[in-house]
């Protein structure tokens, strides 16, 4: 939470940073009510579900803005991965916020100023994205990391402790960069071979 008061006037960028770094449920509600067609969080959830489907989130139904457990509120692991990549590609101006390790809004609650992503600062290229926890889903993490120009996205869910989440996430990142390499087979426009054509204008292409 950002520990917002009903009379606070907060810049949108501060609210976005509060959501990303501090997991600010109150900031989610403020933005949701501002964007909602009817000024309610429920109205925003309907809008978010519709927009999500347009983005390819076909297994997601939202009932609130912050992911708090609610009847009918659900999102698949696959959809989380799709959304993670969309955030990176469609909003490059905001993505660096996911790598911020601390944020103190207006000097409030310094004990709640640290990003909960356990991978940040480990020197493995991690720069996002978001942690989560519910009783049903356990501890989870939507993560991203980049090394030598190659980026990976991954989604973890169902871990039983904070420590398990941190260990599993670091293991996955190290494994992904160690086990896979990028190979360039050809450049655009270059000829890599010929294929025969039957009954065509040319004998091959």
Each language-model region and where it sits:
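Active-site-adjacent loops and short helices of periplasmic peptidoglycan-processing enzymes
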Residues: 1-81, 88-91
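Domain-terminus/edge residues, biased toward the C-terminal soluble/receptor-binding domains
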Residues: 58-61, 69-205
